């Protein structure tokens, strides 16, 4: 039977976390305008949207862990977007091409919905769009890109940052900017590549980190494991001071320099402060098999 992955705004749920709502609360579309979470105190907060990918949910364990890491790090307002029906969570399997194609088609709808939510935050609750960051995994990375395009169409400006966690590869390998996550979708676009099979293997951001050359990740035997590691790497970079260092790399043409030769103007730390480093382009990031994963030989950038 064909999977029913029909997108409907009414099916979207938001899991919202903050320092005074650490266990999270659940919002739906009809409650967005009257919930007391969005008050005058929201204006000054840094807001982070988390957007999951194919077959996943907004309260998957990796996103819950990242949400907790974010609110421990700073007074973030974290909004995890659950579009699980549109992502075929209940109906498809990883081998279901029809279900996946439907989920791909739904990413634009979800992106527009996130952009409309952003408009509400900006216009009604006076949140600065320069304080809003999107973090998307797999299809969620491209969804974040579509949201970034939509907020620009709405003349709201650009998001502060989009972090694409191993943006989905299938159906996107030959896509141009209008049809995928792109460097122009936010003021700064950071991309973490961890699977050459399930993720895109070309530069799409201001900085593109190829962790372990963007191929199989340490400790992983399946592509799905490597694909998910991007989420875990970022979470650990948020939780710990340990810097996962990226050193400049021209794919296919050169061997990256050892991180022992890194300087603050040539290399970049993966994570929320990546934009503070001047270097742009593609970077190779060596990684350890176990958390906190960083392989930096004690180097301080």
From Swiss-Prot:
Coiled coil feature spans: none
SUPFAM superfamilies, alphabetized: alpha/beta-Hydrolases (SSF53474)
Disulfide-bonded cysteines: 5-88, 177-182, 220-225, 242-269, 243-294, 262-267
Entry GO terms, CC: extracellular space
Tissue: Expressed by the venom gland.
E.C. code: 3.1.1.32
Enzyme class: hydrolase
Matching PROSITE patterns: LIPASE_SER
Keywords for the protein's UniProt record, in alphabetical order: Allergen, Cytolysis, Disulfide bond, Hemolysis, Hydrolase, Lipid degradation, Lipid metabolism, Secreted
Residue positions of the active site: 138, 166, 227
Any one Gene Ontology molecular-function term assigned to this protein's record: phospholipase A1 activity
Example of a GO biological process term: lipid catabolic process
Family, similarity comment: Belongs to the AB hydrolase superfamily. Lipase family.
Protein name: Phospholipase A1
Organism: Polistes annularis
Lineage, uppermost ranks: Eukaryota, Metazoa, Ecdysozoa, Arthropoda, Hexapoda
């Amino acid at each position: 039977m064909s999977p029913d992955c029909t997108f409907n705004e009414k099916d979207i749920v938001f899991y919202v976390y903050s320092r005074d709502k650490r266990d999270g609360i659940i919002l739906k579309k009809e409650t967005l305008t009257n919930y007391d979470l969005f008050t005058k105190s929201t204006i000054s907060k840094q807001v982070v949207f988390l957007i999951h990918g194919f077959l996943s949910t907004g309260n998957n364990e990796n996103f819950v862990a990242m949400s907790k890491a974010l609110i421990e790090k700073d007074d973030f307002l974290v909004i995890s977007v659950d579009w699980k029906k549109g992502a075929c969570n209940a109906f498809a399997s990883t081998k279901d091409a029809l279900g996946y194609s439907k989920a791909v088609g739904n990413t634009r709808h979800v992106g527009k919905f996130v952009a409309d939510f952003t408009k509400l935050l900006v216009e009604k609750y006076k949140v600065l769009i320069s304080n809003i960051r999107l973090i998307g995994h797999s299809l969620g990375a491209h969804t974040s890109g579509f949201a970034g395009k939509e907020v620009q169409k709405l003349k709201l400006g650009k998001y502060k940052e989009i972090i694409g966690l191993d943006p989905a590869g299938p159906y996107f390998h030959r896509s141009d900017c209008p049809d995928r996550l792109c460097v122009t979708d936010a003021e700064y676009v950071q991309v973490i590549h961890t699977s050459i099979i399930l993720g895109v293997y070309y530069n799409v951001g201001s900085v593109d980190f190829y962790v372990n050359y963007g191929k199989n990740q340490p400790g992983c035997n399946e592509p799905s494991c490597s694909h998910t590691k991007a989420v875990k790497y970022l979470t650990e970079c948020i939780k710990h001071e340990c810097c996962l260092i990226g050193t400049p790399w021209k794919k296919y043409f050169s061997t990256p320099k050892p991180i022992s030769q890194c300087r603050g103007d040539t290399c970049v730390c993966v994570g929320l402060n990546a934009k503070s480093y001047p270097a742009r382009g593609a970077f190779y990031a060596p990684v350890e098999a176990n958390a906190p994963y960083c392989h930096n030989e004690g180097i301080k950038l």
